[in-house]
Amino acid sequence: MSAVPHLPALRRGRPYESLEKTQVVNHRTGEVMAEVSQIGAGILRKDLRAIGEARAALKRFTVSELIAISAKAGEFFLNGELPLGDKGHTQTADQYVATLSSTSGLPHVMVRRNMTKIHYALTNLGTVINGLSRGLPLDVIDRGFGEQSGAAVSYYPTT
């Protein structure tokens, strides 16, 4: 295992180690904390041409299932030990706070507050979607059509 974690770019859900990388450094000492793969516009355009594959992969799940997965991810983010990159590293929530604080200069308390906000957003995604969609039933998003307040409605994703 490398001493410095490498965070790959994700291309259609798969890790991708790019030739173009940037280093994340400790803002005080200059020590390299991680290496991050980056992709350019050309690769992004190429991946967008295959957007149908990504949509098909997501279609295997209902919106309710995706909301439940997001809530579980929020709990892991706030309380778990998660994989960090593709070289076998892991990171606890406390290590995340220390690393983000040392690379950004943000005080630990602000990093923790932001973590709490991310956790809240992920664990309350159903409420967020309900507000953004003005109460559109989730099965309408799943099927593409349905009924809301006695009126026929349809839904079609644009990207």
Predicted regions and their residues:
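N-terminal Rossmann-like NAD(P)+-binding subdomain of aldehyde/semialdehyde dehydrogenases
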Residues: M1-T159
